[in-house]
């Protein structure tokens, strides 16, 4: 069975993510132990709150390096909401701050003129085929709760786009790294399907590892 770990850095709806994974057949442990995080078969980095505080909490517990270590080892890493933003190079919430630097991109506040944070359902437009989107319609609806998003021209890692005041990547990814700006655990069937797809990706990767 895949060892999926939900990273506990004091910012996230951990139980709801774990329950959603369980609903689609995958058990996950919640841990703030860097060794458990670095040694997981798959990592979920959830998060609700401010970019700077998130990075501080990760660093204080040694979890920033543990996530980087897991990513460098090719373990699947899934960032959700703030967790997705922390995977990127930089965020400007509370002033420019470096992120984990695992994916390109900078996080900036969404433009004024619409209610912020964006809370509720919005369309997600996949831009290319990806196993994460298997079985989903194009576009599909998902549940958002955020005031910051990737800014500028969509980077090469953009897998899906959403419009709210401006068009921004709502799903990003490269190799074993994936980030979702919305909350799949709150996004009904589409969100559960994405979590199931990601869980299968973790299991498929385990099955291809050489035996030791």
Curated annotation (Swiss-Prot):
Transmembrane segments: none annotated. Its EC number is 4.3.2.10, 3.5.1.2. Residues 3-208 form the Glutamine amidotransferase type-1 domain. It catalyses: 5-[(5-phospho-1-deoxy-D-ribulos-1-ylimino)methylamino]-1-(5-phospho-beta-D-ribosyl)imidazole-4-carboxamide + L-glutamine = D-erythro-1-(imidazol-4-yl)glycerol 3-phosphate + 5-amino-1-(5-phospho-beta-D-ribosyl)imidazole-4-carboxamide + L-glutamate + H(+); L-glutamine + H2O = L-glutamate + NH4(+). It comes from the Bacteria. Pathway: Amino-acid biosynthesis; L-histidine biosynthesis; L-histidine from 5-phospho-alpha-D-ribose 1-diphosphate: step 5/9. GO terms for molecular function: glutaminase activity; imidazoleglycerol-phosphate synthase activity; lyase activity. The active site is at 81 (nucleophile), 183, 185. InterPro entries: Class_I_gatase-like (IPR029062), GATASE (IPR017926), Imidazole-glycPsynth_HisH (IPR010139). GO terms for biological process: L-histidine biosynthetic process. GO terms for cellular component: cytoplasm. Pfam families: GATase. Gene3D superfamilies: 3.40.50.880. Disulfide bonds: none annotated. Keywords: Amino-acid biosynthesis, Cytoplasm, Glutamine amidotransferase, Histidine biosynthesis, Hydrolase, Lyase. It is found in: Cytoplasm. Heterodimer of HisH and HisF. PANTHER family: IMIDAZOLE GLYCEROL PHOSPHATE SYNTHASE SUBUNIT HISH. IGPS catalyzes the conversion of PRFAR and glutamine to IGP, AICAR and glutamate. The HisH subunit catalyzes the hydrolysis of glutamine to glutamate and ammonia as part of the synthesis of IGP and AICAR. The resulting ammonia molecule is channeled to the active site of HisF. This is Imidazole glycerol phosphate synthase subunit HisH. It comes from Symbiobacterium thermophilum (strain DSM 24528 / JCM 14929 / IAM 14863 / T). The gene is hisH.
């Amino acid at each position: 069975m895949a060892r999926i770990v939900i990273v506990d850095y004091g910012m996230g709806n951990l139980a709801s993510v774990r329950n959603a994974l369980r609903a689609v057949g995958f058990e996950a442990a919640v841990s703030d132990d860097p060794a458990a995080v670095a040694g997981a078969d798959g990592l979920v980095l959830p998060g609700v709150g401010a970019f700077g505080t998130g990075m501080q909490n990760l660093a204080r517990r040694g979890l920033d390096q543990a996530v980087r270590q897991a990513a460098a080892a090719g373990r699947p890493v899934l960032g959700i909401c703030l967790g997705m933003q922390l995977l990127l190079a930089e965020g400007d919430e509370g002033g420019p701050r470096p992120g984990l630097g695992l994916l390109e991109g900078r996080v900036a506040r969404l433009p004024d003129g619409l209610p912020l944070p964006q809370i509720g359902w919005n369309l997600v437009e996949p831009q290319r085929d990806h196993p994460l989107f298997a079985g989903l319609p194009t576009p599909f609806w998902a549940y958002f709760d955020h005031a910051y998003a990737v800014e500028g021209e969509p980077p090469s890692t953009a897998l899906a786009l959403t419009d709210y005041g401006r068009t921004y990547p709502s799903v990003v990814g490269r190799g074993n790294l994936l980030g979702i700006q919305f909350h799949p655990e709150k996004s009904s069937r589409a969100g559960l399907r994405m979590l199931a797809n990601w869980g299968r990706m973790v299991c498929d990767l385990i099955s291809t590892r050489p035996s030791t």
